[in-house]
């Protein structure tokens, strides 16, 4: 570089290198801070969404247990034609059938409702609302599955599969029948004891003996897909 006709040493390249080096050091620190802030933000967002999702799941489970089923809607006295038609609806996840057979008594004390449901209703709608499920759903005539609350009403604290329960069944048809049931399982339910009796389940073979059938259900139980709520499903069904 020439100044006033003389050659002056040029240190611009060294200065540029020093500035570039300093910028890189500063940039690395800034990038680390930005990366750390971004990672922290992602972690916080994930935590918030996880907590919110967990609360939604907990509220859903609590509501299902309180209702005794995860079915969000139902259709009374639905026909098999309606049953098959509902299965084809794009906003319905699954459909189950239930027959309300009657009530069970020990002496004069009502201890449990008596129902039969199909495999879809049991596995996808009832089981998720219960805990401590032991044994299997009734398959044979005379088999019975009771809630722990009903067993406690019978003063049974240590139930065993295969034990005999002498009970009276007051049927929906108006009949009363003394039956030696065989206990095939039990479960814990969470419905409000001040509102309703616990539910018990018997086999389809048993209710057929009484002249009832899942081919003529009292209720069609419906689980809708997540894109629609239960009230909207019922409104559409009754249109």
Regions found by a protein language model. Give the residues of each.
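N-terminal Sec/SRP start-transfer signal
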Residues: 1-46
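Alpha-helical transmembrane segments
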Residues: 29-34, 40-68
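Basic-flanked hydrophobic alpha-helices used for secretion and membrane insertion
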Residues: 53-239
